[in-house]
Swiss-Prot record:
Species this chain originates from: Synechococcus sp. (strain RCC307)
Protein name: Gamma-glutamyl phosphate reductase
GO cellular component: cytoplasm
Pathway: Amino-acid biosynthesis; L-proline biosynthesis; L-glutamate 5-semialdehyde from L-glutamate: step 2/2
Record-stated family: Belongs to the gamma-glutamyl phosphate reductase family.
Compartments, as annotated in UniProt: Cytoplasm
Biological classification of the source: Bacteria, Bacillati, Cyanobacteriota, Cyanophyceae, Synechococcales
Length: 445
């Protein structure tokens, strides 16, 4: 996902935080500690108040977005980025509904994950707790502010937000509404803050001790820059170079529908496919059926020699295989076998989401086991790689790293755990000497 503000400043030195930013971050952390003590009901009520305030400020938010769009058009922002920047009434109402739905999800906090008697009267439990304060750097996408803020409040975390500069007016209007809502709840409004300058977003990287996790949503270069310039843990949300492999044994109509949806349903999304891999035995029949469908959807196709021989008009370069288009462009390669498809995916994939279309169960299971991406699908669109569609309520990003959380990061990815041990004068020396023995008896959760 491109367009994140620091991506334009990757060669800049990281400045120290200003006194004003330090004060804001310190205040936010104090309020985040209070938020962590709020009850499930209080956090639910806070989300509903946020949704109400967004409804009340709907016209002001949409007007601010119009100003952002006009400025972006004058700057000739790419169509894919304009699509993300645009916040119409439907998108806004959907985001508001999403906040209300998030309030109804089970509480991710105070969940007992382990309950064990180490000995009589010495009881251990592991409880889910908030991370603390998260810093999220994201693209110029106003609806992301609402999703991330709501996830933060529901999971008991404070949030420092930085969107792409093209969305500054929209994000500021949205945050003002969210804070108005929080002011009518038990949660302090300053548990959320918005950074609007490049200098602030860079200085965020030096707020270790005040920020517990940074989630950058952007290019690999952005994620790498942040990892190299902060001591704060980083949860990388990088490029979405997703693949669809069409096996030789396949339901042709189904595969065409899945391919078109995976590319054209919303091409600016990171879970849209960028490369289509076709088994050589199915490629002629598939392309005969798919070329008109792609043309109707407005998709520009770029193919290797074999694909061009079957009707693809433009040639794909080596760079195409490694490109996240975020647009109605799709690269097509014809492969001799699934092994060749797996090799291509291993070389070029960003480990986001890969799909196989096949009717052969054994082939599907092998693909699902061999591909090391956050999401691996059979016979369905890559566009299902989404926190809302997974039933997470929303997502703060999609992690393409191997360590958890992986894939769409929802509420569960924004909590950690704490061990609590309750005793009655127990001392380690008694166990070291053999005077007492551990029982390690698991208790009901």
């Amino acid at each position: 996902m491109h367009g994140s503000p620091p991506a334009q400043a990757l060669n800049q030195a990281v400045p120290d935080p200003s006194p004003e930013l330090l004060a804001r971050a310190s205040s936010l952390r104090r309020h985040a500690i209070d938020l962590a003590q709020c009850s499930d009901q209080q956090r639910q009520e806070a989300l509903r108040a946020m949704a109400d305030a967004l409804e009340q400020q709907r016209e002001a938010i949409l007007l601010a977005n119009q100003d952002d769009l006009q400025a972006a058009e004058q700057e000739q922002l790419a169509p894919a980025l304009l699509s993300r920047l645009k916040l119409d009434r439907t998108k806004l109402d959907g985001a508001i509904a999403g906040i209300r739905q998030l309030a109804q999800l089970p509480d991710p906090l105070a969940q007992r994950q382990l309950h064990r008697a180490l000995d009589e009267g010495l009881v251990l439990e592991r409880i889910s707790v908030p991370l603390g304060v998260v810093g999220v750097i994201f693209e110029a996408r106003p609806d992301a502010v609402m999703q991330i803020a709501a996830l933060a409040i529901r999971s008991g975390n404070g949030a420092i937000l930085k969107g792409g500069r093209e969305a500054n007016r929209s994000c500021s209007a949205i945050l003002a509404a969210l804070q108005q809502g929080l002011a009518r709840s038990a949660v302090h409004p300053d548990v959320l803050t918005l950074l609007t300058s490049r200098e602030e977003s860079l200085a965020l990287l030096k707020l270790d001790g005040l920020v517990d996790l940074i989630i950058p949503r952007g290019s690999n270069a952005l994620v790498q820059f942040i990892q190299d310039n902060t001591r704060i843990p980083v949860l990388g949300h990088a490029d979405g170079i997703c693949h669809l492999y069409v096996d030789r044994q396949v339901d042709l109509d189904q595969a065409v529908a899945v391919a078109v949806d995976s590319k054209a349903q919303y091409p600016a999304a990171c879970n849209a496919i960028e490369t289509l891999l076709l088994h050589k035995e199915i490629a002629p029949a598939f392309l005969a059926a798919a070329l008109p469908a792609f043309a109707q959807a407005g998709v520009e196709l770029r193919g290797d020699g074999a694909a061009m021989a079957l009707g693809v008009s433009q040639s794909a370069s080596d760079d195409d295989w490694a490109t996240e288009y975020l647009d109605l462009v799709l690269s097509i390669r014809v492969v001799d076998s699934m092994d060749e498809a797996l090799e291509h995916i291993a070389r070029y994939s960003s480990r986001h989401t890969e799909v196989i279309c096949t009717t052969n169960t054994e082939t599907a299971e092998r693909f699902l086991a061999r591909v090391d991406s956050a999401g691996v699908y059979q016979n369905c669109s890559s566009r299902f790689a989404d926190g809302f569609r997974y039933g997470f309520g929303a997502e703060v990003g999609i992690s393409t790293q191997t360590l958890p959380p992986r894939g769409p990061v929802g509420l569960e990815g924004l909590v950690t755990y704490r061990y609590r041990l309750r005793g009655d004068g127990h001392i380690a020396a008694d166990y070291a000497s053999g005077a007492r023995q551990f029982t390690h008896q698991n208790l009901p959760l």
